[in-house]
Amino acid sequence: MEYEFRRNSLTGTYLASFSMDHEVLGQWFSEELGPELAKIQQVLDIIKEIQAGKRDSWRLIGGDLTLDLDEEQARIYANALGFEQEYELEESMSLYDAESEAYCGLEDLEEALLSWYEFVQKGR
């Protein structure tokens, strides 16, 4: 999983971009976490608790995206994916979930979060 972090010097916004099949992680980092060090640290602390066996799983529901953690992996997905459709769409009209959902290993997420934390901290 590859990623790149940038900061817009004019607006001060932080942006994360992740490799194909993990694009939604970039959106989650940029929009749900943003430059909030306390929120980043909270997720890192929860990961440590899961790795230590103190928790089995954890969920953080954001404005547009949700993070689910368990002992093996992280899943980030658009909140809209959690809703059941009342009717079936034709095959050609099916919703494209690949950019709305991603899975990665817990350690991979932890590594990316640590890098994001450092990047945001240096930008202050």
UniProtKB/Swiss-Prot annotation:
Family statement: Belongs to the UPF0231 family.
Name the UniProt record assigns to this protein: UPF0231 protein Shewana3_0655
Domain of life: Bacteria
Entries under Pfam families matching the protein: UPF0231
Taxonomic source organism: Shewanella sp. (strain ANA-3)
HAMAP family, per database record: UPF0231
InterPro entries linked: UPF0231
